[in-house]
Amino acid sequence: LLLLSNSGKTREIVELLELSKRMYPDIPAIVITGNAQSELAQNAEIVLFTGGAPEICPLGLTPTTSTTVMTIIGDMLVVGLMEKIGFTKEEYAKRHHSGYLGSKSRGEIH
């Protein structure tokens, strides 16, 4: 289970982890957060700490820097997993059956 919360305090995410632990205790939780001391991080099996960089929003409120860092970490996880399991264009095409990406993965668009 992959959970993302910069503060580590997002109520819905904390509650989701609690529910997951009750219903599916054997599924490990991976948390990406800017607050490694948060309740969310403390209850996860794996914590990927973003460094807690300040948001570039002039008000310091809107998630900006944190969402970019989380996207990069997520992309790294996906690419690493694709390489590990040998994910192919054919597998990709099965999941993108229409549209531009589906056509490109099947070699219909160059």
Predicted segment positions?
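Glycine-rich phosphate-binding loops that contact phosphosugars or nucleotide phosphates
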Residues: 1-85
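Internal, active-site/partner-interface "lid" segment
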Residues: 56, 83-110
